[in-house]
Amino acid sequence: MTKKYFGTDGIRGRVGEFPITPDFMLKLGWAAGMAFRSMGACRVLVGKDTRISGYMFESALEAGLSAAGADVMLLGPMPTPAIAYLTRTFHAEAGIVISASHNPHDDNGIKFFSGEGTKLPDEVELMIEELLDAPMTVVESSKLGKVSRINDASGRYIEFCKSSVPSSTSFAGLKVVLDCAHGATYKVAPSVFRELGAQVTVLSAQPNGLNINENCGSTHMSQLQAAVLAEHADLGIAFDGDGDRVLMVDQTGAIVDGDELLFIIARDLHERDKLQGGVVGTLMSNLGLELALADLGIPFVRANVGDRYVIAELLERNWLVGGENSGHIVCFRHATTGDAIIAALQVLMALKARGESLAQSRQGLRKCPQVLVNVRFGGGENPVEHPAVKEACERVTAAMAGRGRVLLRKSGTEPLVRVMVEGDDEAQVRAYAEELAKLVAEVSA
């Protein structure tokens, strides 16, 4: 059954435009509360990133949940993976995150976690959607939900992150620059790395509600690159606005993407005989990652794009590590969802174990040239399914004669078609990508 509101990563859009409006959030809170209550007693955690609209939507969700008889525990600004973790530790029935992740401040959205700290099953999302179309009724006064605020949430999560590395671990002597994207990691990330002994310089940790992801964080890396060079740091770590993506910069100022970080983590676990199975990537993962893992004898499979699909594949195979080149990295030994801080700590542990710098460690993966072009798509017929686009993709694939890949897909979170071409000749790959992107734009007009 097709979902009306939920995309690949919850519900997301422009603030003030349906469905990202206060009245819809009120009804969504009620519908979610009714759905969760139908499964038993109900406590729901609610957290958010640092967008100014988060306060408005927090109040609306709180009212809707209470009207359905659900007790609400407010966490304030916290990373998305922290809310997944705290939902489990408080034994709540569900967690809700108010965030649009790496998007600008005038977007916002809602993500749900189950009581196990994982994404909601499809059947629960469909139940919520059915209730959204039903009349809203308030439970009797004696059954209204209570609302409380959790004041020590940050401290709990900081200790959880630190527990993902051995208690004897010290990063003393390591000089690190953190870019917190003026987002949800702005308090907790500096504390985690400082308490583990690193010398930390912090960028973009002064959120004002409007500057989240603005020319900073994992989607705008130039500030971090410059700071790593200026500070003569060993490496830089960039988070996105809600703390579920991480990218890095080595001491030369070069960007280290999610594929490379995933390789470093997986190789370390493999060398310590702790990998358990193989690695899950996505359709967008660089071919070089697959080849490098194969050289180590590590199985690799591709899931659809989106961390929920990576997680589903990990669960099905009982594997522990997966991720996306965008920086969503899942380390199931420690967390139930993509966690940027924990992933970064696993990378630092791997570097420490091998006695290597980040620049040295990334050399184990030789990436194939890959060009990604985003084409704005206003709606209507999916251009990926257009006959002319399909024919062009087949022609380009045939021309690369088994030495490359073509992937076109509609984004699940933004009005974009992503055109990706990968092969062994960078100039040719770029030409093919631009040709296909131009065609997609033409058929979308």
Curated annotation (Swiss-Prot):
Keywords: Isomerase, Magnesium, Metal-binding, Phosphoprotein
This protein's record includes keyword Magnesium: yes
Binding residue positions for Mg(2+): S101, D240, D242, D244
Enzyme Commission number: 5.4.2.10
Gene Ontology MF terms: magnesium ion binding; phosphoglucosamine mutase activity; phosphomannomutase activity
Cellular component terms (Gene Ontology): cytosol
Residues recorded as bearing Phosphoserine in the entry: S101
Post-translational modification comment from the UniProt entry: Activated by phosphorylation.
Gene Ontology terms describing biological process: carbohydrate metabolic process; peptidoglycan biosynthetic process; UDP-N-acetylglucosamine biosynthetic process
InterPro entries given in the database record: A-D-PHexomutase_a/b/a-I, A-D-PHexomutase_a/b/a-I/II/III, A-D-PHexomutase_a/b/a-II, A-D-PHexomutase_a/b/a-III, A-D-PHexomutase_C, A-D-PHexomutase_C_sf, A-D-PHexomutase_CS, Alpha-D-phosphohexomutase_SF
Record Pfam families: PGM_PMM_I, PGM_PMM_II, PGM_PMM_III, PGM_PMM_IV
SUPFAM superfamilies referenced in this protein's UniProt entry, alphabetically: Phosphoglucomutase, C-terminal domain, Phosphoglucomutase, first 3 domains
Reaction(s) catalysed by this chain's protein: alpha-D-glucosamine 1-phosphate = D-glucosamine 6-phosphate
Cofactor(s) the protein requires to work: Mg(2+)
Cofactor: how and how many bound: Binds 1 Mg(2+) ion per subunit.
Active-site feature positions: S101 (phosphoserine intermediate)
Top EC category: isomerase
Role, per record: Catalyzes the conversion of glucosamine-6-phosphate to glucosamine-1-phosphate.
Family matches, as PANTHER family: PHOSPHOGLUCOMUTASE (ALPHA-D-GLUCOSE-1,6-BISPHOSPHATE-DEPENDENT), PHOSPHOHEXOSE MUTASE
Family statement: Belongs to the phosphohexose mutase family.
Record protein name field: Phosphoglucosamine mutase
Species assigned in the record: Pseudomonas fluorescens (strain ATCC BAA-477 / NRRL B-23932 / Pf-5)
